[in-house]
C-alpha cells in the first residue's frame, strides 16, 4: 500500500507538504543511520496487513488518538483488551518530545521512529533481527527486546530479502552469529 504512494501532511509550522513514502524512508535512513531497506521492512512487518491494507496505528483516526501515527508499533505492548496494543503504541507516540514526538503526521512518525530504532537498538549493538528479539548483548542482557512475536526475526528477514530483490548475489554479506558457551553437545 506504500509502494509508489505519496501523502500530504501538515508540518509543525502549519504548512502542508506532499512527499512519497520512498523519500520519507530515505530521509529517515539518512537521519538515523539505519538502512532504508530495514526501515521499510520493519514497517511492512509491523503495520501492513495485506496488499492494500494497513493497521489502524497508521490511520490517524483511532478514537482518543486522532492525528497520531506509529508506523513501527513502538510501545505497542501486548494487551488483552481489544485494540489495546494499538492504543498502547499510539499513547507512546503521543507523549514526550523525544524522537520528533508527538507523531502528528506520517513523516514525523517514520523519521522519528527510525531515530528511535537507531538510537536504542541498531546503533548500540542490537543490530540484527535476532538480537532485537533475543538480546544477548552486554547491555540489558535478556531484557531489551523490540518484538514480542517469536517468529518476527524470520518473517521480517524474508521481507528484507525480498526488498533487495535479485541484487543480493552481488552484495558483500557480514554474518553476526552469537556463540554460546557451556551448551550441551
Predicted regions and their residues:
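Soluble non-cytosolic domains of exported or imported proteins
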Residues: 15-23, 33-37, 100-108
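N-terminal export signals and maturation junctions of secreted/periplasmic proteins
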Residues: 1-22
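Short, functionally critical alpha-helical segments immediately adjacent to catalytic or ligand/cofactor-binding
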Residues: 26, 30-51
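Flexible domain-boundary/linker segments
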Residues: 45-46, 59, 130-131
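Glycine-rich, acidic and aromatic/proline-enriched surface loops and short helix-turn segments
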Residues: 1, 45-49, 115-122
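Non-catalytic cell-wall polysaccharide-engagement segments
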Residues: 62-185
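Short, solvent-exposed loop/turn and secondary-structure capping segments
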Residues: 52-62
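Poly-acidic low-complexity segments
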Residues: 1-4, 35, 70
Amino acid at each position: 500500500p506504500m509502494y509508489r504512494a505519496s501523502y500530504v501532511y501538515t508540518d509543525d509550522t502549519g504548512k502542508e507538504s506532499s512527499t512519497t513514502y520512498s523519500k520519507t524512508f530515505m530521509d529517515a535512513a539518512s537521519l538515523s543511520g539505519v538502512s532504508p531497506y530495514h526501515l521499510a521492512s520493519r514497517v511492512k512487518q509491523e503495520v501492513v496487513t495485506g496488499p492494500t491494507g494497513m493497521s489502524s496505528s497508521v490511520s490517524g483516526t483511532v478514537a482518543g488518538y486522532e492525528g497520531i501515527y506509529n508506523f513501527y508499533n513502538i510501545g505497542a505492548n501486548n494487551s488483552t483488551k481489544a485494540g489495546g496494543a494499538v492504543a498502547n503504541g499510539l499513547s507512546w507516540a503521543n507523549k514526550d518530545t523525544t524522537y520528533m514526538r508527538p507523531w502528528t503526521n506520517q513523516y514525523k512518525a517514520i523519521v522519528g521512529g527510525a531515530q528511535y530504532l537507531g538510537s536504542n537498538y541498531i546503533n548500540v549493538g542490537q543490530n540484527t533481527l535476532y538480537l532485537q528479539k533475543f538480546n544477548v548483548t552486554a547491555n540489558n542482557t535478556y531484557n531489551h527486546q523490540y518484538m514480542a512475536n517469536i517468529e518476527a526475526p524470520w518473517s521480517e528477514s524474508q521481507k528484507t530479502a525480498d526488498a533487495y530483490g535479485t541484487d543480493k548475489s552481488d552484495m558483500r554479506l557480514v554474518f553476526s552469529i552469537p556463540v554460546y558457551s557451556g551448551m550441551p553437545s
